[in-house]
Amino acid sequence: MRWVRALLKNASLAGAPKYIEHFSKFSPSPLSMKQFLDFGSSNACEKTSFTFLRQELPVRLANIMKEINLLPDRVLGTPSVQLVQSWYVQSLLDIMEFLDKDPEDHRTLSQFTDALVTIRNRHNDVVPTMAQGVLEYKDTYGDDPVSNQNIQYFLDRFYLSRISIRMLINQHTLIFDGSTNPAHPKHIGSIDPNCSVSDVVKDAYDMAKLLCDKYYMASPDLEIQEVNATNANQPIHMVYVPSHLYHMLFELFKNAMRATVESHESSLTLPPIKIMVALGEEDLSIKMSDRGGGVPLRKIERLFSYMYSTAPTPQPGTGGTPLAGFGYGLPISRLYAKYFQGDLQLFSMEGFGTDAVIYLKALSTDSVERLPVYNKSAWRHYQTIQEAGDWCVPSTEPKNTSTYRVS
């Protein structure tokens, strides 16, 4: 019986390239925050969601799977990247099982929800596993500027695609699993229609403070100020995914606290971390200001690079959060901001401190998913060969101009 199951599995895996080729021809369909809310409103239809997801999830999976294959062979050959590929193939095949199923069958809908939970759990470790693949590549082959550029481009798109896929899965499973989250009864799936920005700020600060106190035995205080330009003197609320905002803020607080404590080791008091939340007609901006000594300008963009992490390589079985050891906190946080058309930027003054600004869309109709699509433009990016720069590179030693004198 075991060999029969193996035969069937191999037969289904053989069909994967055909599915990838087919679904990658379609572009993903980005949803706005308002559409997510409408999808999950009180009259939400599970059949409609099922019909949409069994087409949309394969499109998103297939698009990014085509890009995985464009990575350098030396990256694709690492055990970790091959493992991630196998997860994506299996998840695509899992959804294919429902392509011709009847949405009127309640058992089918229940099985689909169970399949989505299985897929979500299967992909829980995608980020650290892919990060391990990058480390395996670097340890074996060292640094290659062209490959590094392609890997950075790919990982931004790959992780953003992953965020979007988990968003779709979470919305469906949270809304249609037949239960209500007692801690957040008014949430629609993972979305809070009336998210208090300051409350999320305080939650992220409290958790970061807990870690900082545990490690350094001290932590800076928090000061929050709100400016509501659209409705003066009213607390600032928005339609957003609190877990996404928390992820961004928690990462920024950790960085700000560490910098503040380490740059004021000899001081009796620590300067506070200041938060400014401003709501305008288009943007909701959150600025975090610290007095942690700042970062040189040349290092700012490197903080968002997957290839230049200064964090120590995590060791298996040492406990803690694996992601922390890869130095991916800031790059992933910026992707969470960009996912709904926002951004995360750092402005630093070396010798003083750093301002980190999260930009989000104020209106739910403007908060539209930012999704990678596999097309000729993306393909060409991976074929680009780095050429010589067209700007002078400063020399470390002044030139002897006497050699250029006209005789």
UniProtKB/Swiss-Prot annotation:
The keyword Magnesium does not apply. Its main location: mitochondrion. ATP binds at residues 251-258, 290, 309-310, 325-330. InterPro entries: AK/P_DHK_N_sf, BCDHK/PDK_N, BCKD/PDK, HATPase_C_sf, His_kinase_dom. It catalyses: L-seryl-[pyruvate dehydrogenase E1 alpha subunit] + ATP = O-phospho-L-seryl-[pyruvate dehydrogenase E1 alpha subunit] + ADP + H(+). Disruption phenotype: No visible phenotype, due to the fact that PDK2-deficient mice have increased PDK1 levels. Mice have lower blood glucose levels in the fed state, but not after fasting. Likewise, they display increased pyruvate dehydrogenase activity in liver and skeletal muscle in the fed state, but not after fasting. Fasting mice lacking both PDK2 and PDK4 show strongly decreased blood glucose levels, increased circulating ketone body levels leading to ketoacidosis with dangerously low blood pH levels, hypothermia, and ultimately death. Transmembrane segments: none annotated. GO terms for cellular component: cytosol; mitochondrial matrix; mitochondrion; nucleoplasm; pyruvate dehydrogenase complex. It is an enzyme of class 2 (transferase). Gene3D superfamilies: Alpha-ketoacid/pyruvate dehydrogenase kinase, N-terminal domain, Histidine kinase-like ATPase, C-terminal domain. One of its GO terms (molecular function) is protein homodimerization activity. Keywords: ATP-binding, Kinase, Mitochondrion, Nucleotide-binding, Phosphoprotein, Transferase, Transit peptide. Residues 135-364 form the Histidine kinase domain. Pfam families: BCDHK_Adom3 (PF10436), HATPase_c (PF02518). Detected in heart (at protein level). The modification N6-succinyllysine is found at K376. Induction: Up-regulated by glucose and palmitic acid. Up-regulated by PPARD. It comes from the Eukaryota. One of its GO terms (biological process) is intrinsic apoptotic signaling pathway by p53 class mediator. Kinase that plays a key role in the regulation of glucose and fatty acid metabolism and homeostasis via phosphorylation of the pyruvate dehydrogenase subunits PDHA1 and PDHA2. This inhibits pyruvate dehydrogenase activity, and thereby regulates metabolite flux through the tricarboxylic acid cycle, down-regulates aerobic respiration and inhibits the formation of acetyl-coenzyme A from pyruvate. Inhibition of pyruvate dehydrogenase decreases glucose utilization and increases fat metabolism. Mediates cellular responses to insulin. This is [Pyruvate dehydrogenase (acetyl-transferring)] kinase isozyme 2, mitochondrial. It comes from Mus musculus.
